[in-house]
């Protein structure tokens, strides 16, 4: 799989990574055996970026990844974890002492002395803007608790604030055919600064899988049931903030523009990876088949699929169905 530089770290990561929220919680139950099989399938397909967080399954996702990688001592996988959601989202909780506690817990979960990459997990804007935040992170780099750091954000304005900081390695932001604002507002600035962009929620919580209908239901403990209106956390995290029924209309139009041999999720992932300034898209997977299909989408970057035509369709559908409702929100 094609690899791209991770900021200024000297490391390369795959253009399609693996998001592991699904292996922790909030998507229904996934067994340990199934989770391990997903990790193996992704790694065997050339994925060299695993994205996780200390709150995914209260550390379960990190622990599963740590155990898996311990069995592959020669792996080339970069593990990007996140911190900051274990306490109420108040700026005072983003303190050096809490950073240390969270980092040490993740190091134990992953079984490593130095974390590859730690990202603040969608913190309040005041945290992103504070000099003290980056001073504390720089101290963790200096003592080799972490090798690099970045920020996962909700809004384009937050992304730009993080990109302006000299030692930020990456920014995570939602980018997919339902979220186009970052293409013009964030990606050029990231390219100029040498900051990597991870496109998170690349399949809009599965909506871009093309498998859902108006009668589809989800488990009670699945955020696609309990967070559609932002009841538990930012509603942009669920279906990218798009109304489910409107999203289905958009999916229908996007799918109709594809040749029969190209699936909508594969086209979406390839489109994301082809956007200038994107380093990696990080789709999640709950099964070996999903993990393999996501990784295989990278092959569309090598030709045989008209990405320019799909881009034109994406932009038209966005303008017709989505722009008015969501463009100004994030």
Q: Across the structure, where does each feature detected by a protein language model lie?
A:
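Beta/alpha (TIM)-barrel catalytic core signal, keyed to glycine-rich beta->alpha loops juxtaposed to Asp/Glu
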Residues: 123-317, 329-330
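N-terminal binding-site loop/beta-alpha segment at the start of enzyme catalytic domains
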Residues: 1-76
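Acidic-and-aromatic substrate-binding clefts and catalytic sites of carbohydrate-active enzymes
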Residues: 28-29, 53-62, 87-89, 125-128, ...
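Active-site groove signature of glycoside hydrolases
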Residues: 107-126
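Short, acidic/polar
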Residues: 29-42, 94-110, 154-161
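Short, well-ordered coil/turn segments that N-cap beta-strands
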Residues: 11-16, 46-49, 73-77, 112-116, ...
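Conserved, mostly hydrophobic/aromatic
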Residues: 6, 18, 35, 50, ...
């Amino acid at each position: 799989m094609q690899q791209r530089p991770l900021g200024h770290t000297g490391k390369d990561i795959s253009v399609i990574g693996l998001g592991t929220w699904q292996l922790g919680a909030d998507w229904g139950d996934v067994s340990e055996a199934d989770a391990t099989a997903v990790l193996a399938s992704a790694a065997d397909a050339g994925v060299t970026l695993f994205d996780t967080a200390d709150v995914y399954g209260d550390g379960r996702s990190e622990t599963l990844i740590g155990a898996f990688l311990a069995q592959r001592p020669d792996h080339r996988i970069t593990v990007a974890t996140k911190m900051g959601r274990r306490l109420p989202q108040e700026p005072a909780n983003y303190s050096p002492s809490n950073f240390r506690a969270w980092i040490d817990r993740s190091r134990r979960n992953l079984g490593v002395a130095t974390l590859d990459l730690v990202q603040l997990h969608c913190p309040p804007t005041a945290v992103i803007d504070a000099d003290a935040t980056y001073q504390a992170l720089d101290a963790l780099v200096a003592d080799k608790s972490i090798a690099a750091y970045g920020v996962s954000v909700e809004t384009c304005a937050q992304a730009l604030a993080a990109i302006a900081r000299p030692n930020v390695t990456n920014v995570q932001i939602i980018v997919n055919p339902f979220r186009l604002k970052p293409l013009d507002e964030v990606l050029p600035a990231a390219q100029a600064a040498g900051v990597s962009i991870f496109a998170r929620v690349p399949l809009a919580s599965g909506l871009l899988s093309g498998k859902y209908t108006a009668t589809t239901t989800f488990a009670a403990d699945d955020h696609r049931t309990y967070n559609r209106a932002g009841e538990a956390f930012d509603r942009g995290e669920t279906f990218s903030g798009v109304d489910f029924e409107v999203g289905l209309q958009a999916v229908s139009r996007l799918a109709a523009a594809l040749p029969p041999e190209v699936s909508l999720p594969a086209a979406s992932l390839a489109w994301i990876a082809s956007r200038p300034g994107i380093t990696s898209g990080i789709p999640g997977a709950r099964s070996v088949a999903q993990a393999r299909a996501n990784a295989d989408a990278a092959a569309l970057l090598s030709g045989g699929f008209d990405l320019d035509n799909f881009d034109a369709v994406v932009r038209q559908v966005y303008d017709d169905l989505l722009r008015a409702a969501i463009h100004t929100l994030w």
